């Protein structure tokens, strides 16, 4: 018999299993037979016809039907609804309205909806567009129109703001729980009950998490007043998001996140138990599933919850692990002798799951790639749940008539389950269920301020605004009932064939150009175990390196390399080249005169070797360069992408001729990726390469060079010359035999190299230089603070700010600067600074003492002038600099780039 651990292992191992394999398992174990499928389809057609004849779609459904995310106008309205209500100043409001309404083509939507209110709104939007659009010429009529625009702006501003509030009302039951409970009376009289959800997304500060917890606790108290039935299933309930209760709900913070979440959720669960209401844990992104199951087990194991049947879990059928999660939940409830609730939903943020998998380079998707597959999974999981009712109370959340018909057919005469729908949607369908089937119906209703609407609105539009969605098709009477009620088991094959052309597997993202680099998902235990186990043999290794040249260098003083996180912890040592050895290497260097096909094959093989040696590369990047786990993965992937990209470029340009000998002088901040990119580009073109890595990171460059040689690059075509810039760097840039220099580093050094080439090089010598600069972000009051702060943290402080692309200057609109900075402060306080070897670390050290002292001096000067707004503390050992925020008047206050975790903030009006 399978144990709880066995079921958990199945959840883990099926994270990205092949879609066909999962579907075969679901259909063979839980799928309806052919006769039942025919009955389901016939029943679904009847349901569609009854719903259409009963009444028209709701305003929400009509809006989604006309303005889904597949239209530019739908996107414009969504953006307007999300941003407008939090903008404090009239000028920005006017600019936002003009930006979103002005360019859109409202005319094509006039009269297209079956809702007179939606059509009237469309007329109003077209009139608004005609008023606010700028005239193309400057005649008298255009002057008059400009005057009308100026006079009309206050009216338009007021009207649009009111319209956006009304739009919010269609999606949100009430701005507070008392108002929501009052508005809920209408459907309570029809026999429905509610599950309330407090609007808002993931907390990014501890203060935000505390506010969400208080809001949930207060909501339970309010709901308790109307929870009058002895049967918990008849009472309203509450849905909560774990990401709202802890600011770092992610695998890297598992040791803290799970127990703290369990404590908070446990407290809310006990309050819900006392109120005799249900408490549902909402499902979130696929990468958080493992954490949520850990937390659920911890909370349910509390003996104080024994006898309470109201603990609920949401399971997303579009996830490939859904069926195995149900098995695990059933096993857990059985082991603990509990009854729980499970809300089965199709799933949210499908687009994000697909895109994330492609970007991360993982083997496959965590979700199904077609609507048919998701619908099949939903029906099979529903069948599975209906066989678990001794321990699980199923809650089927759907607006789809076919899914409803399937559940009713599978259930037969049983009524030990309920249906659920979203507020403002599926009303007619669920009203028919209440009337004809006598089953329970619950409404999932968001509660909160309209300014919190964005993420919820996006989900609703993504799920229900697509052309293929049931809600959209139901509102469109030109789509036949038979088409809407199509059997997904029948359409699966056609959908899969269409999907293969639309949705590219992560590995094939850049095909036919090149293979995508392999990724490691550190939220997945299988990938995490591989990362840790492959890196482990190199945790204490001492690397030794010397110049890799045609003429071997066997003597010279060894230079020790230390871990920037631990000043006295040696990583290895390197024998540096001197000026004469550099000149000798130039004498022995030769262009790589192999055919293009051979060069291309060798570079591709090198990419494969990089990936095969990922354990050593990860270890060396962490220990020599101070890279965190996420940064080591990103760097390896970038290096592999460079190799494959330039291999393909060589194939595209077979007639191009090499320049000759190229010096590649690379930096320490991307000691593998930029080193590899420079070298690969030069080699792909057939040049001979003399590579000088940064003084601080010669060991990773030596490993890369050895792998390139192992792949087949001849030694005369690639030589490595670690050494000082003043000697080796000068020799490699100031010799007439050098035909070009690739350099990444400071502007001052680039200028020195330029002078060297001008004085000693050939007239046509090439200099490709990537140098410093100051990157800025401008955030006005339309920017969503949570999203903006998250991006600021990533851009300014990831990699300890040691990126050429790092954010250096943030311009904030003065009206919103204070709350923005308060949120930024809170988000910074949630960061972990320390040993980059550990997954929990967000920010590692800067590269060396020189960098540490320069950055610290800049921060100290700002502090002395009263301009240091915040700075985090750091460990005592190592070259750590606490992320800092400094007030400036503008970009002109900075004389140079401060290459570290320092963000400068200016305000504007």
Regions flagged by a language model, labelled:
Residues 707-712, 734-735, 740, 748-891, ...:
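ALDH superfamily catalytic-core signature
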Residues 51, 81-88, 188, 220, ...:
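Structural signal for hydrophobic packing residues in well-ordered secondary-structure cores
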Residues 568, 589, 599, 621, ...:
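Residue-level signal for inorganic ion chemistry
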Residues 197-199, 240-243, 278-284, 314-316, ...:
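Generic beta-strand/beta-sheet core signal
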Residues 1-517:
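Positively charged, amphipathic and often flexible ligand-engagement surfaces
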Residues 204, 270-275, 286-300, 307-313, ...:
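Long, K/E/R/D-enriched contiguous segments that form extended
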Residues 622, 648-789:
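Rossmann-like NAD(P) dinucleotide-binding subdomain of oxidoreductase/dehydrogenase enzymes
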Residues 447-448, 452-455, 459-587, 594-612, ...:
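Terminal low-complexity tails and localization/encapsulation signals of metabolic enzymes
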């Amino acid at each position: 018999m399978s144990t709880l651990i066995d079921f958990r292992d199945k959840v883990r191992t099926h994270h990205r299993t092949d879609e066909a394999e999962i579907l075969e398992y679901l259909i063979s174990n839980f799928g309806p037979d052919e006769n039942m499928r025919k009955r389901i389809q016939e029943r679904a057609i009847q349901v569609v016809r009854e719903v259409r004849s009963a009444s028209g779609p709701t305003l929400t459904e009509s809006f989604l039907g006309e303005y889904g995310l597949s239209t530019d106008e739908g996107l414009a309205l969504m953006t307007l609804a999300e941003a407008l209500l939090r903008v404090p100043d009239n000028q920005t409001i006017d600019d936002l309205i003009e930006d979103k309404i002005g360019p859109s083509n409202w005319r094509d939507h006039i009269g297209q909806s079956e809702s007179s209110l939606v059509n009237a709104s469309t007329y109003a939007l077209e009139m608004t567009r005609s008023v606010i659009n700028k005239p193309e010429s400057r005649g008298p009529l255009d002057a008059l129109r400009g005057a009308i625009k100026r006079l009309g702006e206050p009216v338009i501003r007021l009207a649009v703001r009111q319209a956006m509030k009304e739009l919010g009302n269609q999606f949100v039951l009430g701005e507070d729980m008392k108002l929501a409970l009052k508005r809920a009376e209408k459907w309570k009289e029809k026999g429905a009950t509610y599950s309330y959800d407090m609007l808002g997304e993931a907390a990014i500060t501890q203060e935000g998490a505390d506010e969400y917890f208080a809001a949930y606790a207060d909501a339970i108290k309010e709901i308790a007043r109307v929870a009058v039935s002895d049967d918990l299933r008849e009472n309203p309930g509450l849905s909560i998001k774990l990401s709202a209760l802890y600011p770092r709900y992610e695998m890297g913070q598992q040791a803290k996140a799970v127990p703290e979440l369990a404590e908070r959720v446990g407290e809310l669960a006990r309050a819900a138990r006392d109120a005799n209401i249900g408490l549902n844990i909402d499902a979130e992104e696929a990468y958080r599933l493992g954490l949520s199951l850990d937390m659920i087990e911890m909370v349910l194991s509390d003996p104080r919850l024994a006898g309470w049947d109201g603990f609920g879990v949401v399971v997303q059928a579009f996830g490939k692990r859904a069926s195995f999660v149900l098995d695990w939940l059933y096993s857990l409830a059985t082991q603990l002798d509990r009854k729980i609730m499970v809300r089965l939903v199709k799933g949210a943020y499908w687009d994000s799951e697909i895109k994330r998998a492609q970007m991360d380079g993982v083997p496959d998707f965590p979700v199904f790639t077609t609507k048919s597959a998701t619908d099949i999974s939903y029906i099979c999981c529903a069948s599975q749940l209906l066989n678990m009712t001794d321990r699980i109370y199923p809650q089927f959340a759907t607006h789809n008539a076919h899914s409803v018909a399937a559940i009713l057919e599978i259930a037969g005469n049983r009524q030990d389950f309920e249906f659920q729908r979203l507020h403002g949607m599926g009303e007619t369908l669920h009203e028919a269920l209440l009337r004809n089937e006598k089953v329970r119906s619950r409404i999932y209703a968001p509660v909160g301020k309209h300014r919190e609407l964005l993420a919820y609105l996006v989900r609703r539009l993504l799920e229900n605004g697509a052309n293929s969605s049931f809600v959209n098709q139901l509102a469109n009477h030109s789509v036949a009932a038979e088409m809407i009620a199509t059997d997904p088991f029948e359409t699966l094959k056609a959908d899969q064939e269409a999907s293969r052309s639309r949705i590219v597997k992560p590995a094939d993202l850049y095909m036919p150009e090149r293979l995508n680099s392999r990724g490691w998902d550190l939220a997945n235990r299988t990938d995490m175990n591989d990362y840790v186990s492959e890196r482990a043999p190199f945790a204490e290794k001492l690397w030794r390196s010397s110049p890799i040249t045609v003429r071997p260098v066997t003597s010279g003083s060894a230079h020790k390399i230390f871990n920037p996180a631990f000043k006295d912890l040696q990583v290895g040592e390197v024998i540096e080249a001197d000026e004469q050895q550099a000149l000798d290497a130039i004498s022995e260097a030769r262009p790589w005169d192999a055919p293009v096909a051979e060069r291309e094959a060798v570079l591709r093989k090198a990419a494969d070797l990089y990936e095969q040696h990922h354990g050593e590369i990860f270890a060396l990047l962490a220990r020599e360069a101070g890279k965190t786990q996420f940064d080591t993965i990103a760097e390896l992937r970038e290096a592999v992408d460079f190799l494959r990209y330039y291999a393909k470029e060589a194939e595209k340009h077979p007639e191009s001729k090499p320049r000759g000998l190229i010096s590649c002088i690379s930096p320490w901040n991307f000691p593998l990726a930029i080193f590899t990119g420079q070298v690969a580009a030069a080699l792909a073109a057939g040049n001979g390469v003399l590579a000088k890595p940064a003084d601080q990171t010669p060991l990773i460059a030596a490993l890369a060079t050895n792998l390139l040689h192992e792949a087949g690059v001849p030694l005369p075509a690639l030589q490595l010359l670690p050494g000082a810039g003043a000697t080796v760097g000068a020799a490699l840039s100031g010799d007439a035999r050098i035909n070009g220099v690739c350099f990444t580093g400071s502007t001052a050094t680039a200028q020195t190299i330029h002078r060297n080439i001008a004085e000693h090089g050939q007239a046509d010598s090439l200099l490709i230089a990537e140098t410093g600069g100051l990157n800025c972000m401008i955030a006005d009051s339309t920017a969503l603070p949570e999203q903006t702060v998250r991006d600021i943290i990533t851009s300014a402080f990831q990699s300890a700010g040691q990126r050429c692309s790092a954010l250096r200057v943030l311009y904030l609109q003065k009206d919103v600067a204070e709350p923005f900075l308060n949120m930024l402060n809170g988000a910074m306080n949630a960061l972990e600074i320390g040993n980059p070897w550990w997954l929990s670390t967000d920010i590692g050290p800067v590269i060396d003492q020189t960098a540490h002292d320069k950055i610290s001096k800049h921060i100290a000067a700002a502090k002395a002038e009263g301009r240091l707004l915040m700075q985090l503390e750091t460990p005592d050992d190592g070259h750590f600099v606490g992320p800092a925020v400094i007030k400036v008047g503008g970009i002109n206050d900075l004389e140079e780039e401060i290459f570290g975790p320092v963000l400068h903030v200016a305000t504007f009006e």
